[in-house]
Amino acid sequence: MIVGKVVGSVVSTRKSEKLIGQKFMIVEPVHHMKADLSQIVAIDIIGAGIGEYVLVAQGSAARIGCGVETAPVDAAIVGIIDDGAGLE
């Protein structure tokens, strides 16, 4: 999993049918915890807001964890961090 901060959102009017109704957020991995990533787009099924720190699952864990096993999803916000001492 990646620890990141939600920095924006993405609107997509044309997308796979399996992604209809999904919210897309731009997540910036926390600088000292990132794996050479600058920003990723993740689906958000829990209602994260811009500025919040989140947990992001990737790959099959993202799809299974969000119940979208057959959707073209590579990253999903699976948790909002309430207390992130030392994140910045």
Model regions: which residues?
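N-terminal first-folded block
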Residues: 1-32, 37
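A generic local secondary-structure boundary/capping motif
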Residues: 14-16, 43-45, 65-68
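A structural micro-motif recognizing beta-strand termini
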Residues: 30, 43-45, 59, 81
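Short alpha-helix capping/helix-loop boundary micro-motifs
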Residues: 38-42
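C-terminal structural segments of small proteins and small subunits
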Residues: 55-88
